[in-house]
């Protein structure tokens, strides 16, 4: 339909396995390097470059099965936060080291650095919320930023989502910061910049069967999910995938994504010149503290 355009529909796409790996880097490795070695992994987007490199190389060095299990035991560790789960994660890293030692692609150093995170893992896990792996919250936040670039104010209606409903007060509070300033402030760096306060006017929740807009969004989102899942698996000969691919404009609906690429240079990542190593979370916290003074 001519009514379905990027001006009316926007989507955030998450590669879940890659997102898990980025969480390992951001939640475990980054604090170890920063607090123990005074090294800023966010400088020039090195955290993203490392995530891209490891996602491509780990399966080649240790095998896809060991890599998938690595992501699985990390997920379990973050959910359970128990001594048993922590032990299972670091024991699996030892198994990966043994496999890497037999590989023509040397990755022992990278695995050894990950093993060193055992020094800070309990502190890191303590700070992780239960929703840490749920993409709904960062996706909604990013969509609010995108719609705010298109509209002075807007209302949001979301389907019944427990993680989002639990954060409703947070999003409303960020939007209400407009009362403290007429102009938005840009935080972050390069292609990770966002504008705050959010231009969100109201936030409401509705069952999908009560909202035509949510039902239409569900259909479009399902099509995108199918398309990118098949693309991720390399199943590009699938009949429905080819029909979707033949449309030629699905990518136009994606306003942002967490997806692996082969980009490893600051310029390719859109972070060239970010010598300060801007951490989006820290920039956001600084913004809130400044407004609350």
Where are these regions (language model features)?
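Phosphate-ester processing/binding pockets and catalytic centers
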Residues: 1-293
